[in-house]
From Swiss-Prot:
Cofactor note: Binds 1 Mg(2+) ion per subunit. The magnesium is bound as Mg-PRPP.
Uridine kinase: annotated segments: 46-249
Enzyme Commission number, as recorded: 2.7.1.48, 2.4.2.9
Reaction(s) catalysed (UniProt annotation): UMP + diphosphate = 5-phospho-alpha-D-ribose 1-diphosphate + uracil; cytidine + ATP = CMP + ADP + H(+); uridine + ATP = UMP + ADP + H(+)
Name under which the protein is recorded: Uridine kinase-like protein 4
Record GO biological process: CTP salvage; UMP salvage
Highest taxon, organism lineage: Eukaryota
Organismal lineage: Eukaryota, Viridiplantae, Streptophyta, Embryophyta, Tracheophyta
Similarity comment: family membership: In the N-terminal section; belongs to the uridine kinase family. In the C-terminal section; belongs to the UPRTase family.
Cofactor(s) for this UniProt protein: Mg(2+)
Length: 469
């Protein structure tokens, strides 16, 4: 660290500073010219739907599963889009030899059109989805699909293209016995599509079965959930619906990042946020209500620690079956704002060890000064990283990288803060997908000065009473 002393570094960090790391007026890794686009993207994501992909072999029960999910979620919130709608129209030459056309091959689908429609729906635009006629082998009519909370995509090869998989928040594979699927296919194609049984069996042995083995079954590994017996598995479908309902009640970023947790909002929490965000709130009230909120965040964060079952004898002589939480724990505060969260952690965890990290950039060359004082055995502990504001995410990344370099497993870090900007959430969660983030609210984004908006100003200055005003 050259001639700079630790005292000088802490003094520098005590002056007015922003939540992100800055170099020559620019946020590290993000140019100001791109700020509006980034902020806009973070706002768009809050309008994006929860996308469920349902794949599996032909006649495995995918449509039945989708219908049951829709019925339990209420159809006004859900739209079903079938991959069959995106078959290519057959040419005259292909129509003349239609029985030799492989409808179960990835090339039979217009994947680009599907991606285009999904992109528009994710941007809040209505789209026209084609309706494929299996008697004429053409799309002659369209149906208008409006943006909605939940989009269910269904199709045999839905997981084949990685670009389509990337759109999905949940991937379900319906697994049904091959004989059952064949019997269903014979019934469907002869009764509904007017085909003769000989043609159906010939197509099954020539195209359907090889396609399942070559293209469909290998994509089973991408599924988040595998449902045996399709629509007959009511327990699995009930669990899926419960999970979807939970996700619908969460902030949209929580649907994308499963390790992001926003504590349940109540009028008490909203009221405390109103007070600490108010520029006219006195220092005494700001500290009082900040401490209350910090305590709630810390308690919620502790709930994500591993535990073991434990039985105790109560004063009445009865046995109580409870849990025993992880004892190998420490806190690490990011100087200076993070120190405001230490008292709440000590109040919740008697005698807990707390380390400190200082990350600061100064000068035209953007030299980074880092000071750290951490427990010697930190690699053996679960770590609660304390910083009340997650802004650009760059300071958090530096702190997390330091912890990992000290041997702390990524999955052992829980990052606690009061408010988070979507940009910071993206940066941290994409780089460290196993880290848990616990926050009390997610704000709109960052302004041109890289401050969280609506935000609460410079937290450290307001909490420790070092405002320049």
């Amino acid at each position: 660290m050259g001639s700079k002393s630790v005292v000088d570094m802490i003094e520098a960090a005590s002056r007015a500073h922003f939540s992100g790391l800055h170099v020559n007026g620019h946020m590290n890794g993000l140019e100001p010219s791109a700020l509006k686009e980034t902020t806009s993207a973070s706002e768009d994501i809050q309008r994006q739907p929860f996308v469920i992909g349902v794949a599996g072999g032909a006649a495995s029960g995918k449509t039945t599963v989708c219908d049951m999910i829709i019925q339990q979620l209420h159809d006004q919130r859900v739209v079903l889009i079938n991959l069959d709608s995106f078959y290519h129209n057959l040419t005259e030459e292909e129509l003349a030899r239609v029985h030799e056309y492989n409808f179960d091959h990835p090339d039979a689908f217009d994947t680009e059109h599907l991606l285009s429609c999904m992109e528009k729906l994710r941007q809040g635009q209505a789209v026209d989805i084609p309706k494929y006629d299996f008697k004429t082998y053409r799309s002659s009519v369209f149906r208008r699909v409006n943006p909605t909370d939940v989009i269910i995509l269904e199709g045999i090869l839905l997981f084949h293209d990685p670009r389509v998989r990337k759109l999905m928040n949940m991937k379900i594979f319906v697994c049904t016995d091959a004989d059952v699927r064949l019997a269903r296919r014979i019934k469907r194609d002869t009764v509904e599509n007017g085909r003769d049984i000989g043609t159906v069996l010939d197509q099954y042995s020539k195209f359907v079965k090889p396609a399942f083995d070559d293209f469909i079954l290998p994509t089973k590994k991408y599924a988040d959930i595998i449902i045996p017996r399709g629509g007959d598995n009511h327990v699995a479908i009930d669990l899926i619906v419960q999970h979807i309902c939970t996700k619908l009640g969460q902030h949209d970023l929580c649907k994308i990042y499963p390790n992001l947790y926003v504590i349940h909002s109540t009028f008490q929490i909203r009221g405390m946020h109103t007070l600490i965000r108010d520029s006219q709130t006195t220092k005494h009230d700001f500290v009082f209500y900040s401490d209350r909120l910090i305590r709630l965040v810390v308690e919620h964060g502790l709930g994500h620690l591993p535990f073991t079952e434990k039985q105790v004898i109560t004063p009445t002589g009865c046995v109580y079956s409870g849990v025993d939480f992880c004892k190998r724990l420490c806190g690490v505060s990011v100087i200076r704002s993070g120190e405001s969260m230490e008292n709440a952690l000590r109040a919740c965890c008697k005698g807990i060890k707390i380390g400190k990290i200082l990350i600061h950039r100064e000068g035209d060359n953007g030299q980074q000064l880092v000071y750290e004082k951490l427990p010697n055995d930190i690699s053996e502990r679960h770590v609660l990283l304390l910083d009340p504001i997650l802004g650009t995410g760059n300071s958090a990344v530096e702190a997390i990288n330091l912890l990992i370099s000290k041997g702390v497993p990524e999955g052992n870090i829980i990052f606690l803060n009061l408010i988070s900007a979507p940009q910071g959430v993206h940066v941290v969660c994409k780089k460290f997908p196993r880290i848990k983030i616990v926050t009390s609210e997610i704000d709109n984004g960052l302004n041109e000065e890289f401050r969280v908006i609506p935000g609460m100003g410079e937290f450290g200055d307001r909490y420790f009473g070092t405002d320049d005003d």
